[in-house]
Amino acid sequence: MRPKRHPGLGCAVASALALIGVAPAFAQDTRSGAPVTCANLKSVRVPKTVVAVAESVPAGQFRPAAAPAFGPPIDYSQLPAFCRVVGTILATAESDIRFELWLPEEWNGKFMQTGNGGAAGAIVQASLVDPLMRGYAVTNTDTGHQGAGGDFGWASQPERLVDYQYRAVHELTVVGKALTAFHYGREADRSYWLGCSTGGRQGLKEAQRYPEDYDGIVAGAPASNWSALMALSITIQRNLGEGGLGVDKLGVLKEAAIAACDADDGVADRVITNFATCGFDPTSLQCPAGPTAQCLSPTEVAAAQRIYAGVVDGRGQTVIPGTGFGSEPLWAAYASPQFAIGTNYFRNVVAKDPNWNPAAFDVDRDLARAEAVDNGAAKAMDPDLSEFVKRGGKLITYHGTTDGLIPYGNSVSYHEAVVEELGERRARDSVKLYLVPGMDHCSGGEGAFAVDWLTPLENWIENGEEPAALAAAHPPATPGPPGAPPAPASPPFTRPVCPYPQVPTYDGSGDVADAASFECVEPGGERPARRVLQIGR
């Protein structure tokens, strides 16, 4: 069933454009249904917006500004013909919100914005590729500054910080929809958000603060509990290296956790599926005599326990949980000078002191300061999605259980708070959480991490098909970014990804590489008879 066209479409478009102050001549063009050519989009007057580039790109001819900083290389050679718009939104006198909007010749009638990672600071062209291939008018922003993913040196300008926290995404939603309507002569039938990490946080913030912006939101591994997450970054950083846990021991911890809990689901596949009941204890690795490469000193055991515990305040209350068993190698990112995001955030935003030392971090004092400074601007933990749900909005959140940067337990806590706020029936009809066993941060990992999140969301909104178990695959080794060593070979397999709180459970006899041999079962529910099988790697 195709999405219904809006009644009185011309008037609706004209009204929407008038709200953002579009010049009457162009509003008249849109009312008449006359599309604006790609080149002429440079002349469309949208207040506070400057379009610097509006160019037609023939099929297969786009060349990106730079290779992606992480992830596999992107193949741009198969891109269809599209109109590429590059512009800037001057939301305030300090603002410099840069964006790209890609408008395909063969449009599917829908609009999408994609999210960012870390501290943003760049337009993520790679995130536009798949939506464009699907026919979306799709856009992305640098959120108002240029910089690396863990850098907050730009945040001394208060309005640019607000742009990053939430404003840039909303401003681009309005401007992107308007430019899309001009180009095609009508507004989009549906609007979608797709993002992970900071992009997941941005998606939740849209649902909470601007519930009318998007019909459907995919929020992966959301960095939603913002100040607490920055504190977790510092906690991990402080407990790694000299005087703590050696980075060279992170793989030892991961292997021990897998050995302790992998077979609990009946399949020894290096994926901990019963993650909630895994009872791995790092004291089992404590060296019985002198230190070796395969055991931990008492100091290292204590450091690992502190990281697993997450951020705990002076009353013994968990502020944000630690990351899951099997996620340990990813902790090293927070100890890297290139991604000491928590330290950079506290130095530039909270303490406003370039010499602030994370060794002096005090949970009770400094987290309270951070929450006061943020004042809910970046934080996206408000469980009241009633306005978003009331207008038919749908939300899919996903999170890998071996995400070592953002704990999946935070997504569980938020989802449960939303269910309590909305009530089980309304929540079931509008929000879904999927925990992906063995998936790292947003993608990758030992598990079946390749999932099409967008199609189930489209079917839910456009066809009324409520998503249940989704198909997930662990593909053969994929190439890393340019210059990276080749990924180790691993056999492909498939699994179902289950709506929380269900978990995938082996049927006891089928092919362990086939998702059909697994079913989604409520924790504590009746499970099929199981036997442990090995999957080689």
Annotate the PLM regions.
Residues 27-110, 124-126, 268, 272, ...:
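Catalytic-loop region of hydrolases
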Residues 108, 117-188, 231-232, 239, ...:
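Cap/lid segment of the alpha/beta-hydrolase catalytic domain
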Residues 196-205:
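Glycine-rich nucleophile elbow surrounding the catalytic serine of serine-hydrolase chemistry
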Residues 11-22:
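Bacterial N-terminal signal peptides
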Residues 397-399:
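Short beta-strand/loop motif that positions the catalytic acidic residue
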Residues 2-13:
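Bacterial N-terminal signal peptides that target proteins for export
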Residues 161, 205-207, 212-312, 435:
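A catalytic-pocket lid/entrance helix-loop region that shapes and gates access to the active site
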Residues 186-197:
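Alpha/beta-hydrolase fold nucleophile elbow
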